[in-house]
């Protein structure tokens, strides 16, 4: 009887050791698999023509009599707006800023000679979706100078793509797909399989003009995703 009890106890101990070993192995495997991961980046980038442009034309007049100077500035603004309309710009696409008055005498910080007392500067701005037309007119602004209009050195041109928000979902989908493809290739090369997403960064969109052609916009997004791996 005592011998039988010893056999039973030995069997129970053996089975317990086997079960403990299996549990320990599963725990180690789970720990190993949990710790295996890969972090990849996915890119989506496109180039697209701008669909809106804002062109700001700075013009100035100088003189000593402010009322007379204001009259000349009014004439200058009329010439600029007439030039724009003559070349196809619509009335509602044109805006005119009030003139900025620079009192050269009051703002003088030295005894240097100042040939005129006042400088008036104004801006005539064009905001249009006809980007190609505005680009063409920009190339002809020398015609304003030939009319005696003094253009300032602060003319600015700003191109935009207003449909940017509508493109976000498709670009994010492409960036995620590219990240997943990279992760799958990595898993294949390492003899593993792609499991689930651990973390995902939506990524920041950037929109900027090409250096050699500012009217072409580059839209770019990079997403970062970390996947777990399994055997």
Predicted segments with their positions:
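Short, charged, surface-exposed interaction patches
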Residues: 2-10, 16-231
